């Protein structure tokens, strides 16, 4: 019998599914023994047990599926059940227990047990034994005790048994088994842990591979006494420390225990620890089962028995498949490959990375993949080269994360593109290639490459070269070729690098760094600067107080002051999980953290100073790192070859950052719920069909629902967030258009619209690429504020704004005011008419204050108005962040002001209301006396009444407190509802009842817009008596607080009503009932199975008014054109007294002029004649004189109005404060603008000024010295309260202003071009024509120059060149520009005067000197200027004569630098004998020594040699000699006997003629040294060529001569011999050598036997080609040995 089954170590195994340890029994096939092995498990974590016990109680359901814990989630409220607190002295509920669990207040299970016992004892003491609460408490307490006992019993292990068990296990493992076999099994177990991923593709073992950093987590080592990680376990595997699987299992248990002890239950690390244990034991059990199954099929040899006890894996499978599968060469030697992979895993874990910080902050990366690519892994291993090449092409993405190969997934449609199949004879797509891969139709990689190339060539043949698909093809071909080369370099049987070894190896890591990795590395460096900063004297870490946020218990005010808390833990987590799109995001969070510290703490405190120091260090380090390098500065991007997931073949679904944002917006709208947990988006998920709701599709022209939005998102149809938001807005607008404004759907649409806007704002807050649209932000804020106020509800779900719908639009006290209601405000908000928050607040407060004025203080409307006004102020302050986001005059009215106004109003109203109540009571008393008198006079029957508590009628008993239906006065009406308060029988024997009457909504007077609860009635002020004979039946009226939770027994739903308010027939008003005072009923109430939802319905009068609304639709459409105007705040002219004012002038602080309100401090555009842009003036004084208005203030000028260097840069929209202060009439004002300081320009905007009219000013321009100097700021004015201040919106993140070049730069360029126009006029046409031709066919810069045959020389015509290379043209133009200067009088004057001024002002810059020279020239007399012009003309004539002589000189005697005297030096590829110096003789058809088609060069160029004078060749001349053909089989080597004639013998040896260097290729040798003809015989001699040997401009140093002494080689051979060695060479080292481990110098590469190969082929270098040859030779050797069974050779 195996060991007893029990729970796993972690108590969370009940949730996470940890395996129990019963599998130990399989490894002991001896006789059965009842042995307890509980001590093998680590100690149970008490915190985890507490969480498990709580979860068990919380999740328990009864037979009906109801959660029993719902009865104990919250203790009864003292207001509802005060008697509960008389019985229970220590109330407690599950919410308090959960809170204590979160705060880790339970150190022991006994503490949790005590609280649960208190909870259930309280329930038993208060509730009756037959109540559901009592029964649930008993059940849950029994469940708790059982579960606790199961967990606590795990500590009953015996240490002695554990030791014996361990010895037994070791004995069974080591007996008959080798250490290598054990090591292989342990590596398999480790591999299962390392490669395990969660469903999203994240590596579970990532944080367990290395221990946490002692710098970042010092408390970890204080809590954990025995730290261990996977690296340590890997080292122990390699060192052979484990003698059994049981020993490794102990370390895995310790690893999981440490993680669960340090981390909170429920955290990701806690769950990962459980998963690692689960994976380990799953793999262990799988190995056991697999080995036992195999052993049962084979003979039980001793070795097999030992293997069974060891539970080792089988490696024999697949051998038969190799013989049958043609592609089996990629799967041969699977055991060896697997062993190599496992060893790579353990070795990678053993050595790890050199940087602990890199490992601590490393996040798992997975290659992007789609569902189709994931499906391939089901039939093909990801290490297969076929799969890697296919997936590289298929998964390649561009910079935006889009799949480049997406158009190639499927073939084009034959219907849409019939011509495609006419042009393309062999169409193919990735889908077909995938099918071939699945069917294993590819024998080699070349076959797969051919199909991919066929697909690409098809696309190139069908599409235009400049099309997007054509460019994609080029990119994919480049990627495919690079991947193919890499796969060819690797050994086919090698599985590739493991994830960790490749991620942590230093070799080649710099080449694989992408821009993303560099960005992350920079963030880690900046983070470590803050983390490791210490105080110089004491060594205190400055970041200690910034690691975690302050405790809410100790610092509750912190979270009221700081609205966005931030700490280093959050920043570190964001870096790890790649939450930052760039470095700026992390810097912003750092700055936010430091800003919070300075905002909360006093200036001068330690935290304040630390924040300042750390921020300074961060800025300095960032400045030191410099800007992030561009893509071009980094190495070429490598293909993603799963380097970081080499041992994790599965790929995760990749989402681009944009897709993640879109998904976040969608999920935020979809998952939003209200306070009651109702998901608002349910109604918007799918539209009703046309058959269900045909009128909807008649009204809505563009239907939209969330399913359609989701399908668009999945199809990648949204390119940005705004396009998705547009569809959401359309959907919500459709809902608001079709549904009534007071309907539930309408309000849900508004709320979800608000959620949508908030989510988009949060997501786009990280982008600083553009200036936010302040107008839209203000309108969005006002919209959110309005929706929040109108949706504000009480505890029962009633909207406070419902009662205010009855407020009249016009105040009777102010009949002249325009009407204003919430409906009018809503239309203004929807039409974006509000541009100021204070105006919107005025309108809202006007409606609410009117409601307060027109209603009593104890009325429901009054109380709702006060509540909405308080809520408005609260939400307004939250949205504006108390002025941090929006600074508005509206913020000056606070809750304190509201309370004062309400108290003052109540003091004024209360005496009047008391008097009204007194008069009302007297009137009611008089009416009651009258009714009693009339009833007494009617008869004496009332004097003989017999009262009772109940009576019977028609076999029914009626009690006092019952609700009954009473026969209506008219037959068509519904029966009345009466609550019986008295029952009696008169002397005549007739039974009567007296009670309060309840009215239905249609029996009250109310507005059609009012909404009511379903089945709602109202308690009236009408009481009367009715004969019992008129009773029609029973019903029940319940108070609103009980109606939704309880239901009466034995009553139908239609006979149950709800009452929330009382109705006064005299005042025709409703008032909410606070205390239910009706008589106690005999009806028994029970809890509802499911609480009723709070649903309000429209009034029955609403349908009647709907027709009137439809009649007014046409009028509203006509008036919609008038709805686009903006509402303006009421302002007034504000005069001001000026002590030093001029007589007759009336001064103002604020003035209305020409439909524009202007105040002191405003900036305006003023008319400026002759300027490109109007100047800007600032109003510092405003006055009116004789009916004309004027203002006075400084003038701002634009950059083009200042004198400055053309190279100076300016901010966009920058202006400068000038020295001018002018008085201007108001008639010259063109419009308002705003001039902001640099700091304000980055951070805020006035809300009423368009962005185009926002200007930046940080400098003052001094006209006298032409200097720009920064100044502190503009003058500020203190204005009266009547002046309306501007509202200022502050950005969440400062913007980055862009600079632009000076406007004078273009003018300066045009001026210079005009000066040189005359000089370059003649040559420009030729050069431009040559440049146009060169753009069509651009010759190669260094073409291969080949020696023509004799027959070809005779046929080569003379073709003069038609184009000039750009490099040559540029050099010629540069040279010519130095010679050709258009001399003018000013240039001559400047050359003479500049030296004089320079001597007078030695400290002046070049620009300042030029400005002074220009001033002197302008001040020069006319006669002097004419004299300079005359002298300049003579100089120009002399230069022209010299230029003409130079142009004629080449025809007679060529000189260096001319086309005739320059030859192109072409360097051929290296030959086995070294670089041969060949001689090239000019031939017919050459232009100055160039073959046809090669352009001449102007001037010396690198690689060219300028020759001396040389006679030109004539087309009719004799054919020159050419080089003899090379020796057969050795291209490029001349025959013997030719070396001493036309070719230098060797590089570095003296050439004939005494020159110490050999002639360069293509350079003519000395006279008389010409090559002989290839065959004997006479030939016509050409004219002699006169040459002047010149020194080459560039001579490469000769290569170093390498000698190999035979004696040295023999000595090395003798030293290598050893008696212990079976071979002469170190063949094992040679066999293990790899290309990436061997680095060759250039000298070593030059000595490689490159002559073995014709060329390097598709390889990058010749060394790579030789490595490939070596691999092929080794493989062939192995194949020959295996094919012929050469085991003993």
Swiss-Prot record:
Top-level taxonomic group: Eukaryota
Modification type Phosphotyrosine: residues: 134, 1289
InterPro entries xrefs: BAH_dom, BAH_sf, Bromodomain, Bromodomain-like_sf, Bromodomain_CS, HMG_box_dom, HMG_box_dom_sf, PBRM1_BD5
Result when mutating residue 895 to S: Found in a lung cancer cell line
Gene3D superfamilies: 2.30.30.490, Bromodomain-like
Signal peptide: none
Bromo domain ranges (all copies): 41-151, 177-287, 381-487, 518-625, 653-763, 769-879
Positions with biased composition (Polar residues): 499-508
Primary location group: nucleus
Molecular function via GO: chromatin binding; DNA binding
Composition bias, Acidic residues: 157-167
Result, substituting residue 674 to E: Found in a case of clear cell renal carcinoma; somatic mutation
PROSITE patterns from the UniProt entry: BAH, BROMODOMAIN_1, BROMODOMAIN_2, HMG_BOX_2
Residues joined by cross-link Glycyl lysine isopeptide (Lys-Gly) (interchain with G-Cter in SUMO2): 96, 154, 210, 425, 471, 511, 591, 638, 653, 1106, 1111, 1167, 1293, 1308, 1398, 1642, 1654, 1656
Consequence of substituting residue 597 to D: Found in a case of clear cell renal carcinoma; somatic mutation
Entry-linked PANTHER family: PROTEIN POLYBROMO-1, SWI/SNF-RELATED
Name of the protein in question: Protein polybromo-1
Source organism: Homo sapiens
